[in-house]
Amino acid sequence: MAFTPKSTVVNRHENLNYAIWDGIEKPVLAGTGITDWTEDASPNTDDGQYINEKNQHSNMTGYAPSVSYSGELIPDNAFVMHVYEVGKKKLIGEMFTAYEVETWAPIEGSAGEFAAHKSEYEIQPSNPGSGEGGGKIALEGTFAQKGNSLHGKYNVADGTFTEGVYDYKTGTFKADGVGA
């Protein structure tokens, strides 16, 4: 059967985030309890204007990516509890690896493998777990990306990531170094 790209708007629940950190053996779904996971590429620019020009110019020189997050404390969710503990214990330098899995972009001919992106993040809580009377315990902050993202595929059954190139038009995947 020929690959057909999705022809409708992709919804947030179709991009899953799995996370792993020191002390756990397999990535866990960072879903229940997280109410917002908004990426900000934050491009860095070198701006200027030459004396003979009317308009300023701007050249992108890199990125300072991060994720702003918010959520609710659900103690049986391993990822949410990890984020809560980092904030409440005022831990510094706590990292995790995130796999953003595009379930709308399956690997042609596979079962349970999808296009994915791997990033390393430091947890920087701003609200470590508090809220108003009668309300839910809220979590808010930033996941600051460290280093470059890697691109490839993710197997949701066994939690493995393989670096490579996914073709969004054909659904095909080539592992890095294969057929290059």
Model-inferred region functions:
Residues 2-74, 121-137:
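Solvent-exposed edge beta-strands and adjacent loop segments
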Residues 8-14, 144-159:
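Short secondary-structure transition/capping segments
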Residues 17, 34-35, 83-91, 142:
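Generic hydrophobic, helix-prone segments enriched in Leu/Val/Ile
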Residues 32-37, 101-151:
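Short beta-strand and beta-hairpin "edge-sheet" elements
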Residues 54-120, 148-156:
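Extracellular/virion structural assembly segments
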Residues 74, 132-144, 158-168:
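Short, highly charged low-complexity linear segments
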Residues 154-180:
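Intrinsically disordered, low-complexity terminal/linker regions enriched in Pro/Ser/Gly
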